[in-house]
């Protein structure tokens, strides 16, 4: 149930208006143009609601759902409640995301102003139509682009450059960074701090001063409590269209290619390079100074200790080709059964 405390329902919406809005929908030739009041999961939908199916695990619920309509994959041919209108989409999950925007808007709004409790240096440049929240600190020579939002308690260090349409949530810290347009940084993220660099001499760990920065491209999202260290000599670089989940650690000098996705609790050690459109599952570990090729994927909890060729899929720790990992898992189960049966004898 969507809470009206936080989101405003913009419905009802006519079914034909929904189809027109989503553009790439294939609908039955004749449908009743009913009013749709809300979006619900298949199990909870009523005759006034629309639902969606993107994961085939939930296709059984389509037989019993009460939804008036349901967005399904383009090639879906399974059974469904005959009273539910099936709307076939090229990408049903993408269509669902657009539908959320069509039906809901956040109640929380941001006035175009700098709150009185914010501290903004005289030499800072704040663009047009920006919101600077309570207790934000913006230091000297910072540049913030038009239409940006900096929420309460965030710190923007000297010389940082943030592009247009940024949304920086509460208690974010940004230092030594240049950030592009349309970037979202969720609460508690820390960007541009010293990396983990020490030189050991005669039993003493001496800190290496980091003189690189962090460069973040356009249309990037960085999750809550994620940390991105600045480079020691070479910059840490996050290219356009990347999506980085919560609680990710990105070490100094790491380079992440365009469109890559990094899931929660992943750690990437210093000076490793992640190619374009890579996918790293949850709790993946990447050792330092490695190269992960374009389009490579690492399954959850994979431990990567050597380079991965472009397009390869690996899993396990140490990470190996995914099919080998599956075979190993099967063999281990068989060995365990054999050893258990011998122990019983």
UniProtKB/Swiss-Prot annotation:
One of its GO terms (molecular function) is N-acyltransferase activity. Keywords: Acyltransferase, Lipid A biosynthesis, Lipid biosynthesis, Lipid metabolism, Repeat, Transferase. It comes from the Bacteria. PANTHER family: UDP-3-O-ACYLGLUCOSAMINE N-ACYLTRANSFERASE, UDP-3-O-ACYLGLUCOSAMINE N-ACYLTRANSFERASE 1, MITOCHONDRIAL-RELATED. The keyword Acyltransferase applies. Pathway: Bacterial outer membrane biogenesis; LPS lipid A biosynthesis. It catalyses: a UDP-3-O-[(3R)-3-hydroxyacyl]-alpha-D-glucosamine + a (3R)-hydroxyacyl-[ACP] = a UDP-2-N,3-O-bis[(3R)-3-hydroxyacyl]-alpha-D-glucosamine + holo-[ACP] + H(+). Catalyzes the N-acylation of UDP-3-O-acylglucosamine using 3-hydroxyacyl-ACP as the acyl donor. Is involved in the biosynthesis of lipid A, a phosphorylated glycolipid that anchors the lipopolysaccharide to the outer membrane of the cell. This is UDP-3-O-acylglucosamine N-acyltransferase. Homotrimer. The active site is at 252 (proton acceptor). Pfam families: Hexapep, LpxD. Gene3D superfamilies: Hexapeptide repeat proteins, MurE/MurF, N-terminal domain. One of its GO terms (biological process) is lipid A biosynthetic process. Its EC number is 2.3.1.191. Belongs to the transferase hexapeptide repeat family. LpxD subfamily. One of its GO terms (cellular component) is membrane. The keyword Lipid biosynthesis applies.
């Amino acid at each position: 149930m969507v809470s009206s405390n936080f989101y405003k329902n913009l419905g009802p919406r006519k079914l034909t208006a929904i189809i027109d809005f989503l553009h790439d929908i294939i609908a039955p030739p004749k449908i009743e143009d009913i009013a749709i009041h809300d979006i619900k999961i298949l199990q909870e939908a009523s005759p006034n609601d629309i639902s969606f199916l993107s994961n085939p695990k939930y296709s059984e619920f389509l037989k019993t759902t009460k939804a008036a309509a349901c967005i399904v994959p383009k090639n879906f041919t399974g059974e469904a409640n005959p009273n539910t209108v099936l709307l076939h989409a090229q990408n049903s999950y993408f269509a669902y995301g657009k539908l959320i925007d069509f039906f809901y808007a956040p109640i929380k709004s941001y006035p175009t102003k700098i709150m009185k409790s914010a501290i903004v240096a005289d030499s800072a440049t704040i663009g047009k139509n920006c919101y600077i929240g309570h207790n934000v600190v913006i230091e000297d020579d910072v540049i913030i682009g038009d239409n940006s939002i900096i929420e309460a308690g965030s710190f923007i260090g000297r010389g940082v450059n943030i592009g247009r349409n940024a949304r920086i949530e509460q208690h974010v810290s940004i230092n030594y960074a240049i950030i592009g347009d349309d970037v979202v940084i969720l609460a508690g993220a820390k960007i541009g701090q010293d990396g983990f660099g020490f030189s050991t001499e005669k039993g003493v760990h001496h800190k290496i001063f980091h003189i690189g920065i962090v460069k973040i491209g356009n249309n990037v999202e960085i999750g809550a409590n994620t940390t991105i260290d600045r480079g020691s000599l070479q910059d840490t670089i996050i290219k356009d269209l990347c999506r980085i989940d919560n609680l990710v650690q990105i070490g100094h000098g790491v380079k992440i290619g365009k469109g890559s996705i990094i899931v929660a609790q992943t750690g990437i050690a210093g000076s490793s390079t992640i190619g374009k459109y890579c996918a790293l599952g949850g709790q993946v570990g990447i050792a330092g100074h490695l190269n992960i090729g374009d389009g490579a994927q690492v399954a959850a909890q994979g431990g990567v200790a050597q380079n991965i060729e472009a397009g390869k899929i690996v899993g396990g720790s140490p990470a190996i080709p995914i099919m080998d990992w599956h075979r190993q898992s099967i063999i281990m189960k068989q060995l365990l059964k054999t050893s258990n049966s011998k122990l019983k004898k």
